Amino acid sequence: MIRHILKIMWNQRCSNGWIFAELAVVAAVLWMMIDTFWVDYRTYHAPLGFDIGNVWRFKLSDLDAKAPGYVPDSLYHSSDPEDLTRLMTQIRQNPEVEDVCVTFYSCPYSNGNSWREVKPVDGDTIYAAHMESFQMRNVTPEYFRLFRIRTVDGEPVYDKVAGRHNVIVITPEMAEGFYHGAPNIVGRRVYHGGHDLSSEIAAVSTSIRTNEYERPEASYFQCLEGETYNSTVSSFGASSAEFCVRMKRPYTQNEMNLFLDGMGERLKVNNLYVYGITPISSFREQQLSQKEREANNKISLMVFMLVNVF
């Protein structure tokens, strides 16, 4: 029957050309829809490269000069990096806390967008002739342990960077662009922020994605340790840090509020203090809601096109 109908349509193709045109449009639209949905599905369910379970972001600020407990400059004997380090230590000592780290515009789902020019010192690659800009994440070494980031070989990145100064961690996409699959990438050096500063590659992490709707891109982590930590904290200010804490078990908002109440003065170092908390999952929901609206608009447009074809 179908062959007979197609045969009739073919014999009358001159008068029924519009039918073939409509079928071609329908087929094209269906293919676009299926291809788009499949790509989005695969992208959404691909590994992110990090884990935000039980992670909270503590909000930091500086006491106002008129606030009770304010420490005047005449009595201030520590620096911003020292205060931030001490605050991390005080919170980490709580038995309910699993880990603590600090980042600057680099926390997952924070919309951080710091870029820096990078070039391999010894790479014979497409990037060797001139500096290229890549997204940079400023993180303390504990970041890799807290968010459970691993190397391409499945080992903890934290073990590769702990206690080391002036090292970076690059993603596989950046490693491929620099060295095109060459062995022994770890230990090589790259220039970043100009030719006056070079850092050693301590590890190649797994691919890192910004969110569930984005594909992984070439990027790198600058490990804040030693002088790099001091200069970065002094530049941005301790209260600008993204202070992340992973708890040992899931907590509700009310339970976390009680946790803060129990910490008391341990949430304050000189004029630096914690004034609030937000689960990282809330930042995820905010960021994905916009992406989901865009995806729904795409679906609506495709359905509209399909309905109009019929």
What label would you give each PLM region?
Residues R13-R42, F50:
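Short, strongly hydrophobic transmembrane alpha-helices
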